[in-house]
């Protein structure tokens, strides 16, 4: 679709200020913990690629949107890594991988656009090995009753139309908790350089607590 191709073309320029001011550092800090066999869901245009450390053995990057995936494939082809990188068209809701095959799953700015966040998180848990980790950066809904939450609710529909289906008012923390992930270890951050309605973030690594639920 034309709208998908346009969004894929403007995605990196639109995020550029936020990447320089905050998100690039957030990505680097989070992905320093990646190791072993890694799956990144909703990899988009591949902005995480340059941040993966050499502790990764193999990286699979999945992106269901064809226009985004075309940009991702070009980025993969243009970057040298000490590990193999495989591009998959799989959506997060229906991952074509056996149970327990990944040491780490990465989700950065993905769950806001997932067609079914609950199913996506169930799939993440399924493909993680026992003791594996979910590394995530997700923007979230403002505190209940806050001015920000009211603004997000008011602008949710036009923002979703503009931003490729992104739900600025989604309660992602609730989805994580409902899926059995412990959210206590997540820290809150701010996405500087981006509109206020997507500025609140949760960031963290969920490890063995995934399997204690």
Short names for language-model regions:
Residues 1-36, 47-51, 66-71, 152:
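Conserved class I S-adenosyl-L-methionine
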Residues 5, 12-17, 137-198:
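C-terminal alpha-helical "lid/dimerization" subdomain adjacent to the S-adenosyl-L-methionine
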Residues 39-94:
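Class I SAM-dependent methyltransferase SAM/SAH-binding core
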Residues 90-105:
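A short acidic, Gly/Pro-enriched loop at the edge of an enzyme's catalytic core
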Residues 103-116:
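A short SAM/SAH-binding and catalytic strip from SAM-dependent methyltransferases
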């Amino acid at each position: 679709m034309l709208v998908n191709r346009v969004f894929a073309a403007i995605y990196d320029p639109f995020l550029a200020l936020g990447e320089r001011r905050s998100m690039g550092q957030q990505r680097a800090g989070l992905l320093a913990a990646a190791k072993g066999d890694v799956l990144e869901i909703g990899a988009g245009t591949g902005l995480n690629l340059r941040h993966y450390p050499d502790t990764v053995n193999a990286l699979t990057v999945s992106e269901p949107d064809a226009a985004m995936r075309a940009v991702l494939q070009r980025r993969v082809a243009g970057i040298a890594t000490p590990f193999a990188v495989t591009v998959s068209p799989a959506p997060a809701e229906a991952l074509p991988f056996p149970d327990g095959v990944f040491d780490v799953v990465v989700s950065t700015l993905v769950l806001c656009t997932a067609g079914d966040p609950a199913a996506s998180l169930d799939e993440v848990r399924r493909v993680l090995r026992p003791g594996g980790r979910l590394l995530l950066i997700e923007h979230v809904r403002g505190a209940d009753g806050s001015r920000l939450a009211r603004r997000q609710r008011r602008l949710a529909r036009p923002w979703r139309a503009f931003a490729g289906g992104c739900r600025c008012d989604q309660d992602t923390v609730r989805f994580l908790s409902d899926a059995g992930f412990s959210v206590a270890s997540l820290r809150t951050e701010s996405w500087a350089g981006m509109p206020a309605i997507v500025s609140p973030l949760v960031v963290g690594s969920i490890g063995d607590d995934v399997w204690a639920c």
